């Protein structure tokens, strides 16, 4: 999703009256086998500066802490590393590639696990980091983003996180698929 957003913002820069200064950063959390060479090459191909911030987040989350909810801690540490680097570079905005499905899954997880309805807003200012977070793809469906990635020939980086595919987010994604299929089935039956 992130490379799709970067590519879309690069295209937008051709037409948008105010030029965007694009800079790509990847937070390498330290999972074995993660290879960001394709990201670097992609950024070079579209002429966007790129850097990789190396961290020991995987060690902290999976060895030192052994948290039962590693995703939450990992996300917080990744964001912290990113915001720190943004501050060092004097960058005050970050664009996350959260899509509509991410928004729905986040709201569903909040409802199930926290007993409240919460999801991220499209724009957030974080005073402690001095950063504004924007989510330009928040209304784009995941399938649309995936099609854009395929059509543009963007190479996807394989996630080597040991809990990938067995997370609360994955559960929320599967639950939404079940709900959608039930609603679709009900809608089809009502039409008959």
Placement of each model-derived feature along the sequence:
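ATP-dependent adenylation/nucleotidyltransferase module used to activate substrates
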Residues: 1-107, 113-116, 143-151
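Catalytic subdomain that performs nucleotidyl-dependent activation
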Residues: 22, 103-181
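Structural signal for conserved beta-strand scaffold positions within catalytic alpha/beta enzyme cores
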Residues: 26, 52-54, 135, 158, ...
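Residues at alpha-helix boundaries and short interhelical turns
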Residues: 33, 180-184
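Proline- and acidic/polar-enriched loop/turn elements at helix boundaries
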Residues: 55, 160-162, 192
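Conserved small/polar residues in nucleotide/adenosyl-binding loops
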Residues: 185-192
């Amino acid at each position: 999703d992130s490379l799709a957003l970067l590519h879309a913002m690069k295209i937008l820069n051709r037409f948008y009256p105010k030029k965007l200064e694009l800079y790509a950063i990847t937070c390498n959390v330290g999972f074995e086998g993660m290879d960001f060479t394709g990201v670097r090459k992609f950024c070079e191909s579209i002429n966007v500066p790129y850097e990789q911030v190396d961290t020991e987040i995987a060690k902290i989350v999976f060895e030192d802490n052994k948290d039962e909810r590693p995703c939450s801690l990992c996300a917080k540490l990744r964001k912290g590393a990113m915001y720190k680097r943004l501050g060092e570079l004097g960058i005050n905005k970050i664009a996350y590639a959260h899509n509509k499905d991410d928004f729905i899954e986040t709201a569903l997880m909040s409802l199930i696990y926290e007993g409240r309805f919460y999801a991220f807003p499209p724009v957030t200012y974080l005073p402690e980091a001095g950063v504004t977070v924007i989510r330009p793809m928040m209304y784009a469906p995941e399938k649309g983003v995936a099609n854009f990635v395929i059509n543009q020939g963007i190479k996807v980086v394989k996630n080597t996180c040991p809990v990938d595919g067995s997370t609360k987010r994955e559960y929320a994604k599967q639950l939404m698929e079940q709900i959608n299929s039930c609603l679709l089935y009900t809608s089809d039956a009502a039409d008959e």
